[in-house]
């Protein structure tokens, strides 16, 4: 150690591990694996679930506690929060909110099963530029049980909230409240087309928000993307 007496210049083993795995997008290169005692190429979260879906758990779920610090401070665009909004007759719409700008997207989902939800979300997220595909924070709903498939399709890492902790997706919860003006709980959401959902999202994205200094989410996101190298 070059600076043994200066704690500000020290890093923990966890920091080193996380840096290596983030650079390799969760999977280490083979030459690095040879130096690990576990010989494990893909790292399993200490907070992840190893139980099967029969117990209501998500296999290898990565905890919100392991998100990069840049997600929390909202300084960098491309980090999203997501959820399923429920309507009448067991209908649902997937909602996505970008944390930096509060820009939202609404995605039509024919069913709540994980294969259907992941396929619909993947199709929409893949259309975003790479600078807007950094992470997604979701709750513990089994609709994201196939989160690994979503990550493979979009290159977006999924992080899961603690159980019964909706405040950990505050932007999404707040925007869902605004969305209820257009999609009330007693309405069958399956009757809305994707074009109609896009039109509703456009209204919200063009509405000035106090939390953004009365900028609109659309203009905030556009400016952020333009300034991101």
Give the location of each predicted region:
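Mobile-element integrase/transposase regions
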Residues: 37-94
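Active-site beta-loop-alpha junctions of metal-dependent nucleic acid enzymes
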Residues: 86-89, 106-130
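RNase H-like two-metal-ion nuclease catalytic core shared by retroviral integrases
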Residues: 138-154, 159-183, 190-202
């Amino acid at each position: 150690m070059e600076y043994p007496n200066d704690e500000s210049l020290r890093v923990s083993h966890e920091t080193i591990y996380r840096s290596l795995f983030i650079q390799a997008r969760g999977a280490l290169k083979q030459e690095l694996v040879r130096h690990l005692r576990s010989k494990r190429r893909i790292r399993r979260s200490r907070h992840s679930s190893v139980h099967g879906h029969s117990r209501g758990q998500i296999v290898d779920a990565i905890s919100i506690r392991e998100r990069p610090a840049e997600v929390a401070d909202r300084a960098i665009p491309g980090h999203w929060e997501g959820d399923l909004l429920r309507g009448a007759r067991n209908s649902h719409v997937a909602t996505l909110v970008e944390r930096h700008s509060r820009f939202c997207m609404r995605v039509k989902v024919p069913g709540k099963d994980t294969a259907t939800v992941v396929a619909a979300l993947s199709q929409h997220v893949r259309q975003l530029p790479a600078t807007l595909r950094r992470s997604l924070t979701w709750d513990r709903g089994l609709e994201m049980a196939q989160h690994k498939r979503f990550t493979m399709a979009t290159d977006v890492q999924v992080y899961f909230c603690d159980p019964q902790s909706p405040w950990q997706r505050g932007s999404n919860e707040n925007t869902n409240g605004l969305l209820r003006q257009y999609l009330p709980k007693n309405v069958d959401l399956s009757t809305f087309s994707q074009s109609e959902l896009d039109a509703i999202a456009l209204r919200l994205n063009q509405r000035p928000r106090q939390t953004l200094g009365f900028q609109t989410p659309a203009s905030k996101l556009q400016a952020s993307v333009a300034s991101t190298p």
